[in-house]
Amino acid sequence: MNVIEEIHRRLPNTHLVMHGSSSVPQDLQDIINQYGGEMPQTWGVPVEEIQRGIRHGVRKINVDTDNRMAITGAIRKLLIEKPGEFDPRAYLKPAKEAMRKVCAARFTEFGSAGHAGNIRALSTAAMAKRYASGELHAKFGGDAAKAAAE
């Protein structure tokens, strides 16, 4: 996190990505293992650390493992509790709900909940035009260049 903070200090307009930043919730790991899974004990990135990264320029966080754990746990649970169930609609519904809960929690924890109205959809052609014009090119100069040189 110190490196992320230093990058943000030197290049405050640079957006960063945290790869492999799932929190790997213990409760989801427990559900998977309780219902026949064999997921070894593991840990992820604490949500508090991700929040710290967000305060210092992180704008994309890869947390898919948490979603996969929620889905897997819900499916395993239903298939153990209802072994005669074979209709995917029956076990995909709770899986989708489990994933929705994880996503809703992350939206809130990461400060993005309630901002959907601020997003304006653009066509591929409109985005191509913005890239071609240079509008979206990284800008290094001014105070950011001075800070990076320090």
Model-derived features: where do they sit?
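Alpha-helix-loop-beta-strand connector modules within alpha/beta enzyme cores
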Residues: 1-18, 22, 26-34
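Short, surface-exposed linear patches
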Residues: 3-5, 38-41, 82-85
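Hydrophobic faces of well-ordered beta-strands that scaffold small-molecule active sites
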Residues: 16-19, 39-41, 59-63
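Active-site beta-loop-alpha junctions enriched in small/polar residues
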Residues: 19-25, 44, 64-66
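C-terminal alpha-helical cap/extension of soluble enzyme domains
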Residues: 34, 45-150
